[in-house]
């Protein structure tokens, strides 16, 4: 009896993984407009220099690399 239950508990997740289920509507990936509002804008970021329109932090900073050019370049 226990071995049958073990086989059932092993086979069911393999046949029907949870990723096969459709996500519900509350997922952030379904709402890109709200996801964009959560990002900090260039004007508010502490490493962004508004006068020179560039990032005054280290060029290796992930935010600077992704959003603005470095002032040192």
Curated annotation (Swiss-Prot):
Effect on the protein upon substituting residue 65 to A: Decrease of affinity to both Nav1.2/SCN2A and Nav1.4/SCN4A
Which Pfam families does the record associate with it? Conotoxin
Detail the disulphide connectivity of this chain as listed in its UniProt entry.
54-64, 55-70, 59-71
Protein source organism: Conus striatus (Striated cone)
Q: What is this protein called?
A: Mu-conotoxin SIIIA
Places the protein is found: Secreted
- Reported effect of changing residue 66 to K? Decrease of affinity to both Nav1.2/SCN2A and Nav1.4/SCN4A
Q: Which residues form the signal peptide?
A: 1-20
> What happens upon changing residue 69 to A?
30- and 500-fold decrease of affinity to Nav1.2/SCN2A and Nav1.4/SCN4A, respectively
Please give the record's comment on domains.
Answer: The cysteine framework is III (CC-C-C-CC).
List of residues that carry Cysteine amide:
71
User: Which GO CC terms are listed, alphabetically?
Assistant: extracellular region
